[in-house]
Amino acid sequence: MRRILKRHDVLADEWRLFGEEAAGAVDSGSDALIVPLAELRKDTAAWLARPGRLGVRLAPSESVESLSDVLPHLTLVAVEFPGVGEGRGFSYGRLLRDRLGFTGEIRAVGAAVKQDKIFLLARCGFDSFELPPEEKADEALAALRRYDVVYQPAEPIEGIERQRFFA
């Protein structure tokens, strides 16, 4: 089972990925399902009409702006980080929060989600992280709390949000 770092806790993932179930059909009725953007675009209306929570998985080669029409219907956007040299996802987090006004969960997923990037991803608007199997949960949690003072402005973190990330 996938491990998710969220709100200073490591949790079992409550979301399923499209294709994990045998059928993988639009009308599967599963409560929380993440589908690739390409799959969502095959029949957007059917996916948006399905019961339960819907998330989309965004590859580095796909445009964040292409989500603008469906974003109000999504609960989660999972941004892929397939390799260490791929940094577009950092910008995707900021674009989702600042330009598109997405208030749902933004999750960093992929092999390159490592403890050295978690704090920086949080500053770019990410609020959950899928930990690769080789990552140690306690070290990932420590990485999120590593700095309590920053010198450059980024994602505005105020009030209860600040307490959540820096407590």
Give residue ranges: language-model regions.
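A positional/architectural concept
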Residues: 16-57
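C-terminal helical cap(s) of enzyme catalytic domains, especially alpha/beta-barrels
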Residues: 138-167
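Active-site-adjacent beta->alpha loops and helix N-cap segments on the catalytic face
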Residues: 38-46, 84-97, 137-147
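Catalytic cores of alpha/beta
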Residues: 64-69, 113-131
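Glycine-rich phosphate-binding active-site loops on the catalytic face of alpha/beta enzymes
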Residues: 124-144
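Short beta-strand/loop segments at the ligand-binding rim of alpha/beta enzyme cores
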Residues: 49-56, 95-109
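Short Lys/Arg-enriched alpha/beta "domain-start" segment
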Residues: 2-20
